[in-house]
Amino acid sequence: MEEPGATPQPYLGLVLEELRRVVAALPESMRPDENPYGFPSELVVCAAVIGFFVVLLFLWRSFRSVRSRLYVGREQKLGATLSGLIEEKCKLLEKFSLIQKEYEGYEVESSLEDASFEKAAAEEARSLEATCEKLNRSNSELEDEILCLEKDLKEEKSKHSQQDELMADISKSIQSLEDESKSLKSQIAEAKIICKTFKMSEERRAIAIKDALNENSQLQTSHKQLFQQEAEVWKGQVSELNKQKITFEDSKVHAEQVLNDKENHIKTLTGHLPMMKDQAAVLEEDTTDDDNLELEVNSQWENGANLDDPLKGALKKLIHAAKLNVSLKSLEGERNHIIIQLSEVDKTKEELTEHIKNLQTQQASLQSENIYFESENQKLQQKLKIMTEFYQENEMKLYRKLTVEENYRIEEEEKLSRVEEKLSRATEQLETYRKLAKDLEEELERTVHFYQKQVISYEKRGHDNWLAARTAERNLSDLRKENAHNKQKLTETELKFELLEKDPNALDVSNTAFGREHAPNGPAPLGQRSSETRAFLSPQTLLEDPLGLSPVLPEGGGRGPRGPGNPLDHQITNERGEPSCDRLTDPHRAPSDTGSLSSPVEQDCKMMFPPPGQSYPDSALPPQREDRFYSNSERLSGSAEPRSFKMTSLDKMDGSMPSEMESSRNDAKDDLGNLNVPDSSLPAENEATGPGFIPPPLAPVRGPLFPVDTRGPFMRRGPPFPPPPPGTMFGASRGYFPPRDFPGPPHAPFAMRNIYPPRGLPPYFHPRPGFYPNPAF
C-alpha cells in the first residue's frame, strides 16, 4: 500500500509549487489573502480546480444519460414502424396469393381456348381458300377489263393527238388575230392620242383667242374712256383758255385805250416841256435831292398861298408824268408776261393736237389688228370644223373595222369553247379510266396485303402457341425442382428446431454463415452468389422479420399432409392449410430464343451489387422476371435483417398467429373456387411491391461453420439460435431491443438476395394466346 501512496506525493508537491509560483506572479491587488477563511491559499485553489472538473464530469454524465434515453425512445419508434411495415407486408402477400390463383385460372382457360382456337383457325383457313378462289376469278375478270380499257386508252390517245393538232392550228390563228388586233389597237391609240393633241391645241387656241378678244375689248373700252377723259380735260382747258383769252383781249383793249390816253397826255406834256425848261433853271437851286423838291412842292402845293398858279400846274403835270412812266413800265412788264403765257398756251395746244392725232393713229392701227385677228379666228374655226369632220370619219371607219374584228373573234372563241368542251370531256374520260385502273390496282394490292397479313398472323399465332407450350414445359420442370427444394427446406427447418432446442443461447455466431454455408454445393466465394443459394432463397424473406421460418412446407420431409403431386397445380398446402406456390427457376436451364425466357443465371451474374449501406443506382436496378409468383406466407430459413431489430420466436412458430393472418387465410380458402373474379382493389395495393420497391442489399460476410445436418440429400449446416423473447409470427414484440454489449466483434448480417427475381415483370398480364385483333384495311 506504500508504493501506490508514495507515487502521487511528488506530483502533489509539483502542483503546489506551481500554484505558489502563479500566486507569486500575480500583482498585489490580485493576490488572495494568506489565510482566507482560515485556510491556506494552496488548498483553496486545489479545491476550486477539483470542483471545476467535478462539474464537467457531472455535465458529461447527464448528457450521456439524456442521450441514452433519447436513443431508447428512437428505438421504440423504429420498432413500432417496423411492426407496422411487417403487417402491411403480410396483407400484400395475401393479395399476391389471390392474384396468383387468378393467374392459374387464367392459364387453365387459355389452355381450353387454344383447342377452340385451332378449330376456328381451320374453319377460317377453309373460308380463306374459298375467298382466294373467288378473288382469283375476279382478278382474271379485272385483267380482261384492263385490256379493254387499254385499247380504249389507245383510241382516246389518237383522238387526243388529233385534237392537239387542231388546237395548235387554232392557237396559231388566234395568235395572228391577236397580233392584228394589237396592231389595230396601237393605231387606234395613236389616232386617239393625235385627236387628243389636236383637241388640246384647239382648246389652247380658243383660250388664246378668247384672251385676245377680252384684251381687245378691254383696250377699246379703256381707250374710249381715256379719250373721253382727255377730251373732257382738254375741253375744260380750252374753255378756260378762251376765257383767259377774252379777259386778256379786254385787258388789251383797256390797256390800248390807256396807252392812247397816256400818249395824248405825253404829247401835251411834251408841248409844255420847253416852258418847263425855262422855269427849271430857276428851280435848280436846290438840286440836292428830288425828295426835298417834292416835299417842297408838296408843301408849296399845300400851302399854295405864296406860289403862282402856273407853276403849280406845271409841277403837277411833271409828277403825273413820272407816275405815268412808272405805270407804263409796269404795264409793259405785264404785257410781256401775258404774251409769254399766250405763247405757252399755244405750245400746249399744239402738243394736245399732236397727242390727239397720235391716239387717232393708234386707234386705227388697233382696229386694223382687231380685224386681222378676227379673220384668223374665223380661219382657225373653219380648220377645226374640217379636222373634226375628218377625225369623225376616221373614227367611224375604225369602229366599223373593230366591230368586224370583234364579231370574227367572238366566232373564233365560240369555236374554241366547243373544242375545249370536247377536250375537257376527253380528259374527264381519261381521268375516269385512270381512276378505275388505280382502284383496280389498289384492290389487288389490298387483297394481297390482306392475305399476307392473315398468313403472318397465323404464323405468329402458331409461334406464340409453340412458345406457350415451351414455357409450360419449363414451368413444369421448375415446379418439379421447386418441390425438391421444398423437401430440402423441410429438412433445414427440422434441423433448426432441433438445434434451438439443444443450444438456445448460441446467438454470437455470425448470421452470414448460415445463408452461405447452407448452399447445396458448398459456400460461395466472397463477392459472388451461387445459383444454388439463389434457388433455395425466397424473395419474400427480405420484408419479413429476421430469421422467420416459413410455415409453408410443400411436400416437405414427412411433416403433415402434403399437397397433391400434380406439377400443374400451383396451389399446394402445408400442414397448417396455407397455400404455397413458390416457383423457383432452374439455374442450369438453357436460354430460350426470346429475350424474356433467358437464363436467370446469366442475368443474375451480370448484376452488380453496391456496397452495404448504399442503394441501387438507376441504371443498375435488378431486372424482374415474369411468370414468377409466391405464396402468401412462404418463408425460408436463409433470410436475415439488420441485427438492430428483434428476431422472431421460433418456439412459438407453430402456435400463436395474429387474427389478421387467420382471417386472410380463411378468405383465401373461400376464394379458391372464384379464381376468375377480378379484384379492382388489387392493382392499387400491389403498387407497393412494384418495380420501384427495391431494398438495399447487404454485403455477404462469411462466418464460422455450423453443425452439419447429415439426414438430408445435401450436407447442411445450421446455426444454433438463442430463444428470443416471445412475439408474433411476423416480428418481435415492440418493447424488446437486443442487448448491445455482446463480447467480441459485431455480428455480420445474413447474406441476402434481391426481393425480386432477375427477370423483368411487365405491368400487365400476357395476352391470351390466340387473341389477335382483326387487321383493319
Curated annotation (Swiss-Prot):
Keyword line: Coiled coil, Membrane, Transmembrane, Transmembrane helix
Coiled coil: 118-269, 339-498
Sequence ranges of Basic and acidic residues compositional bias: 572-591, 662-671
GO cellular component: endoplasmic reticulum exit site; endoplasmic reticulum membrane
InterPro entries: cTAGE_MIA/OTOR
Subcellular location(s) of the protein: Membrane
Annotated membrane topology: Single-pass membrane protein
Transmembrane portions of the chain: 39-59
GO biological process, one term: vesicle cargo loading
Annotated stretches, region: Disordered: 541-671, 721-742
Similarity comment text for this entry: Belongs to the cTAGE family.
Name under which the protein is recorded: cTAGE family member 15
